[in-house]
Amino acid sequence: MILVTCRYGADLARGVLDLHARGIFVLNLKPCNFLLDEHDHAVLGDFGIPSLLFGLSLPNPDVIQRLGTPNYMAPEQWQPNIRGPISYETDSWGFACSILEMFSGIQPWRGKSPDEIYQLVVLKKEKPIFPYSLPAEVENILSGCFEYDFRDRPLMSDILHAFER
């Protein structure tokens, strides 16, 4: 199961990287937005948020603050005016939340309300629980995705590299 999830992670990282190369943020990465194609490759679905923002060079922080699913939102999505603007690294946080859920079967902050998640993620700086026995390189890169300063998170190209090994 770990190898399959790593393969899906690489597929998804490639998809996100392709969108980033086109100047598009995803901002709502979560397992229910992932699909499997006829060749058992994971692909991204649901482009509602990127479509909404397509063509806007600097999205309004008030709009961004309301976009995303709380269990997968990076700190700057909750408070863009305080924590910095959204960036490609914002997608790194959502990607890592999604992959941890795929490895463990447990949604990050499951059972918590949006207000509780805000308290845990933004104010207490809590990070999701990691399952045991992840490959070291994958665990290291995912851990880096949860840095609170988005500038310290890995880029999707770094994530892809870790998942391709």
Predicted feature residues:
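Activation segment signature within eukaryotic-like protein kinase domains
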Residues: 8-9
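Catalytic-loop of the protein kinase fold
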Residues: 20-36
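Activation segment/activation loop of eukaryotic-type protein kinase catalytic domains
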Residues: 37-70
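Conserved catalytic-loop aspartate of Hanks-type protein kinases
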Residues: 91
